[in-house]
Amino acid sequence: MFGFVKYLFKLQFLFILAAVLAGLYRTEIKQFANRHAANYVDKADVETVSLQFKAANENTATVLTSAELSKYNGEDGQPIYLALLGSVFDVTRGIKHYGTGCSYNFFVGRDASVAFISGEFEEYDPQTADDVLTLKPNDLLGLANWRDFYEKEYIYKGKLIGRFYDEQGEPTTYYHKYLALLEQAQIAKAEVDELRSKYPGCNIEWSEAKGTRVWCTNTSGDGKERAWTGFPRKLYSRGNKNFNCACVPESELDQIDAEGQAAHGDVMFKTYDNCSSRAKECFYRV
């Protein structure tokens, strides 16, 4: 008799789980199931059938065309949507930022991913507005941070048909190229972060008369005291024209200066222009 009751409970549990996946009564059902499961199911079975929730929209994402997305502009009672890297988010609760006449209204009803980096909100060109493959590695990292922000703060609504997703909502070749470039940028950043832990940053100051001054001390960078002072060098990362100042110990200067990159892939050290290789400080103007 108990076995039959146990079977009925498990059958009931499957219906409950189906309702959960449909997004119905999630909190109430979970509380009920967790409260009563132990009365009918063995401990081992409880562990086996423990509830695992997923957001209802993870596997049922809406696919929108550009024309459909443009209608979600907050006018005539419509919610406010925007797209970033082909993912659509409902930002209605941020109306003070995205409403008509507000600072981020430029992004509403479209995918203007590039503008998140460029800051150019004056003109919208649908041919280039979401062409992120033209961005620099650090910009791709910044864009990924923006996407993380929207996933955390706003409601994901679906996918935009275009560069990143096709009519079935599947990732396009373009999207895979973007992911490959993003991975390269992440690897390059990890390399630089590793080098920064080994080669601390410089002290930096600016004056109108002399421009930017960089120099090393035995506490420059992270502020922790070390046994050596070091000499300032430009530290570049892969595909990036910008650089950071790093302090390099004297014992490694000859190797780094001779090889140009010290066997760290595309991460490179360079001397400052018009500055001696053994100078304690260097000056430059941007």
UniProtKB/Swiss-Prot annotation:
UniProt-listed InterPro entries: Cyt_B5-like_heme/steroid-bd, Cyt_B5-like_heme/steroid_sf, MAPR/NEUFC/NENF-like
Q: Which SUPFAM superfamilies match?
A: Cytochrome b5-like heme/steroid binding domain
Start and end of every Cytochrome b5 heme-binding domain?
61-145
Question: Per the UniProt entry, what species is this protein from, by scientific name?
Answer: Drosophila pseudoobscura pseudoobscura (Fruit fly)
Pfam families linked? Cyt-b5
Query: What is the annotated role of this protein in its UniProt record?
Result: Heme-binding protein.
Notes on the domains: The cytochrome b5 heme-binding domain was proven to bind heme, although it lacks the conserved iron-binding His residues at position 98 and 125.
Question: Which subcellular locations apply to this protein?
Answer: Secreted
**Alphabetical keyword list:** Coiled coil, Secreted, Signal
User: Which protein is depicted?
Assistant: Neuferricin homolog
State the signal peptide span. 1-23
- Similarity section: Belongs to the cytochrome b5 family. MAPR subfamily.
- Which portions of this protein are annotated as coiled-coil regions? 176-200
Which coarse location class describes where this protein primarily resides? secreted
Instruction: List the GO terms this entry assigns under cellular component, sorted alphabetically.
Output: endomembrane system; extracellular region; membrane
